[in-house]
Amino acid sequence: PGFASAARFVALAFMGDDRDNRALQGIKVNVVMGRSAGFLTAASALARQAADDGPHLIYLPERVFDVEKFKQDVRDTMAKYGRCVIAASEGISDKDGNPISTSGEKDSHGNIQLSGSGALGDTLAALVKEAFPGQKVRVRADTFGYLQRSFPTIISPVDAREARAVGDYAVNHAASTGQ
C-alpha cells in the first residue's frame, strides 16, 4: 500500500482507539511510523469527527519534543476532557536532535531502531505517569509498527489502481524485452 492506504489505517486505528478511550477513560499513547517525516502521524487527525475526538495531542518529528511541555499538554487535556489520546511519531527528538527513546538496537540499514521494540511508547507512558505524581492514572501505549504500511483490507482505491498499473507495466515490459 501507498500513503493513502497507510494514512487510512492510522486514521481508522485512532477512530477505534478513541472510542475505546471514551469507554475506558485514561491516557492512550500510540506510536506511529515516521523517523523524520510526520505525515503518517499527522494523518491521525483525520480520525477527528467532533471537537473532543482524539487524538487530542499530536507530536511530529519535524518539531522539537519538549518533555515538560508534553507533560503539561497531557495534564491540560486531562483537565479539559477527562481523557487523552496521543499520536507520537517514532522520530520525535529533543532540541539537540536526540531521539526521545531508542531500543539501542540497529535496523538492517544501520539506523537506530526507533519503534520496533515499543521502547518509545513505554518511555512516553512513564513520562505521563510522572506528570501525575501521587495519582493513579490509567496509561496504555501501543506501537502500530508494520501493520500501518501493510494492512491489506484497507487499501485505498488509488493505491490499488496504481499498484495494478505498475504490475501490468512490469509484466508487459518483461514480456516485450524478454527480461
Give the positions of each predicted feature.
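Accessory alpha-helical/coil subdomains and C-terminal extensions
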Residues: 2-140
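Phosphate-moiety recognition in structured ligand-binding domains
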Residues: 150-179
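Active-site pocket-lining segment
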Residues: 140-153
